[in-house]
A protein has these predicted regions:
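C-terminal hydrophobic helical "lid"/dimerization subdomain
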Residues: 1, 265-310
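Glycine-rich beta-strand-centered segment in the early N-terminal region that forms part
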Residues: 21-38, 50-91
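Short glycine-centered segments of the SAM/dcSAM-binding site in methyltransferase folds
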Residues: 84, 146, 170, 229-230, ...
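Mid-domain Rossmann-like dinucleotide-binding core that forms the NAD(H)/NADP(H) cofactor-binding site
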Residues: 121-193
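NAD(P)H dinucleotide-binding glycine-rich loop of Rossmann-like/cofactor-binding domains
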Residues: 78, 88-151
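N-terminal Rossmann-like NAD(P) cofactor-binding module of classical short-chain dehydrogenase/reductase
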Residues: 86, 209-210, 232
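A short acidic, Gly/Pro-enriched loop at the edge of an enzyme's catalytic core
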Residues: 201-208
Length: 310
């Protein structure tokens, strides 16, 4: 089978299409014929060595997949051969998503939403679970809450806006002028152009901030929260200074790293199938163009998600 392998850390050009053996499913696992694989910022960080989750190369990066069950091992009861599935298996261990086939624990996958084709389904798991686990599981966002989503035009942000709206929240978001119309179509009630306006002046009395940017943005987000507000960060999980400053103000600071979650995947699928959640693809490229997909991710300018198809 084909797989995108890297033999060293570095820029996008370290990614190369190779031939390798097809994996075999073990107890409680399924073999998935991958039809599409999502490309995420974490993939680029692993590729560069900035976040060495997978140790030293060689390895095949990628977690988001959508495809068809081709083989099941003993112990699998949730799926049958031919079922269409999607998920983010094994995170943070190696899943090898940039390939024609992957094996995955059956309980880390869910049935693909009927309303989505494989590329759109592959774009959903990591970004969608990050948003869901941050807003719903960690912060308990619900009706009447006032939520600020940073970088609303990005992969996580554009899904977070819709999830918060589906749960009855008022949503503010930061975005560039070029993405303002896009985030409004997702349901954002107020758009703050971070290039011309200080969000700390424009946003006040916020119940929950979802930080997808980190650094000074995370720290200054404390200024916009109500006295009992919550900052959920998906990039500053181990920032002791941020946590201490939040505690000093009586605020909650929660760090969230997405983990495989079939319940969350099913909840996301339900939102998709009811029309409350749509996945925006910025670029769809063939597996052989993985390096170009990473260049797009590294640019930081994509609106929505980047996906590889097999």
């Amino acid at each position: 089978m084909r797989a995108v392998t890297q033999r060293s850390f570095g820029g996008p050009d370290v990614l190369e299409l190779t031939e390798t053996d097809r994996p075999r499913p073990h107890l409680n696992e399924v073999l998935v014929r991958v039809r599409a694989a999502g490309v995420n910022p974490i993939d680029a960080h692993v590729r560069s060595g900035a976040i060495p989750l997978l140790g030293e190369p060689p390895f095949v990066v990628g977690w988001d997949v959508a495809g068809t069950v081709e083989e099941i091992a003993s112990g699998v009861t949730r799926f049958a051969v031919g079922d269409e599935v999607f998920g983010m298996p094994l995170m943070p261990r190696a899943a090898g998503g940039y390939a024609d086939y992957v094996t995955a624990p059956s309980r880390q996958l869910a049935s693909k939403p009927a309303a989505l084709d494989h590329p759109h389904a592959a774009a959903l798991p990591l970004a969608g679970l990050t948003a869901w686990q941050a807003l719903v599981d960690a912060a308990g966002v619900g009706a009447g809450r006032r939520v600020l989503v940073h970088a609303g035009g990005g992969g996580v942000g554009h899904l977070a806006i819709q999830i918060a709206k589906a749960r009855g929240a008022e949503v503010l978001t930061t975005a560039s002028a070029a993405k303002a119309d896009f985030v409004r179509t997702l349901g954002a009630d107020e758009v703050i152009d971070y290039r011309t306006t200080d969000f700390a002046d424009a946003a006040r009395d916020v119940d929950v901030v979802l930080d997808t940017v980190g650094g000074d943005t995370a720290l200054r987000s404390l200024d916009v929260l109500r006295p009992d507000g919550t900052l959920v960060t998906v990039v500053e999980m181990h920032n002791a200074t941020l946590a201490r400053k939040a505690a000093d103000r009586g605020l909650r600071c929660l760090g969230v790293t997405a983990e495989p979650d079939p319940v969350g995947l099913t909840a996301l699928a339900d939102l998709v199938d009811t029309g409350a959640l749509r996945v925006h693809l910025a670029h769809t490229l063939p597996l052989s163009d993985a390096a170009q997909a990473h260049r797009l991710i590294d640019s930081g300018t994509t609106m929505g998600k980047v996906v590889l198809t097999t």
